[in-house]
Amino acid sequence: MREFFKKYDFLVLPVSQVAPFSIDQEYPAEINGIKMNTYIDWQKSAYHISAMGNPAISVPAGFTSDHLPVGVQIVGRHRDDFGILQLAYAFEQKTQFAQRRPPICSK
């Protein structure tokens, strides 16, 4: 991470590796052909960032074609909490995703 942040100010990535899934499903059994053995396995994109100790924030980023919410995670350099808050605010102001609501429907 240190090498990455020598060149870049932020890392922006999906909050999770999959879209929201059915409440009846404990966790995705497979993602892109890779078996998920535990509940934590499917959350690796968020889990590894948290373990690094870098400041991170999640912000709304729209909806899937099924109208389920998705988000992006903004990660900053060590101790740059204010920087990620500024970028998150700018993203929300520009996209207005936080103001959007999906149509209420059931499939």
Regions found by a protein language model. Give the residues of each.
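Serine-dependent amide/ester hydrolase catalytic core
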Residues: 1-51, 102-106
